[in-house]
Amino acid sequence: MNPPITDMAALGRQLRCPEGALAQEVADYIFASNEYMIRQTIDRLFLTSGERILEVGFGNGGHLPYLFAQGDNLHYTGIERSEEMLLRAREQYMSLIEQGKAVFLKATEGAMPRLPEEAFEVFFSVNTYYFIQDLRGYFERLYPMLTHGGRLSLGYIDKDFGERMPFTKEVFTFYTNEQIGQWLLEVGFSSFGISSYTEEIFSKNGRTVTRPFHIAMAIK
């Protein structure tokens, strides 16, 4: 699937926060490009029935049926900075909202909404950390929201690969696995580990590209 925007700088800004007339097309492009990574990140959570899940950056929400198929009586809280994506999710998944199985919240700029302590057993996010200015501080604010033994799963593309992409020059910041692990451990997480993968994707000119990505996992 080709990106709906040919201006790479503009595409990068839309990947950060889909908005305007192209928001839906951009969000669908993001999901199509990242579905495998999203599913792998969810799989690393090893969800069990009744768990409460927090996700930052749910995009078009196309992965939620897969997520809810992982266990019974799951409860999902999704946080998203894009107003268009928030409205789409609330409309598309109204039945989950009405059943008390899902909540969709608006993120403030670069900050985690205030949520109760020990409210979630699991947290995951895919391709979002690049846009957070103070990532260590973000992990620090997230930590109290997880229960004791709570699990974190963070999916992201490899730093060297990401920095070579034409759309990452403005609003993206990449870190090494070691830096991410150091920050997670500093704020209190333990049992940090990395799983690394590759997948074949299509570039904007139709060529096949091997994209390396990682999933960072940690336990409170």
What are these regions, as identified by a protein language model?
Residues 54-111:
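Class I SAM-dependent methyltransferase SAM/SAH-binding core
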Residues 151-181:
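Conserved class I S-adenosyl-L-methionine
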Residues 113-123:
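A short acidic, Gly/Pro-enriched loop at the edge of an enzyme's catalytic core
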Residues 22-42:
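Conserved SAM-binding loop and adjacent beta-strand
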Residues 121-134:
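A short SAM/SAH-binding and catalytic strip from SAM-dependent methyltransferases
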Residues 190, 200-220:
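Core SAM-dependent methyltransferase catalytic element
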Residues 136-148:
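A short glycine-rich, Lys/Arg-flanked "PGG" loop and its adjoining helix->strand segment in the class I
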Residues 1-22:
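N-terminal, positively charged/glycine-rich alpha-helical extensions of SAM-dependent methyltransferases
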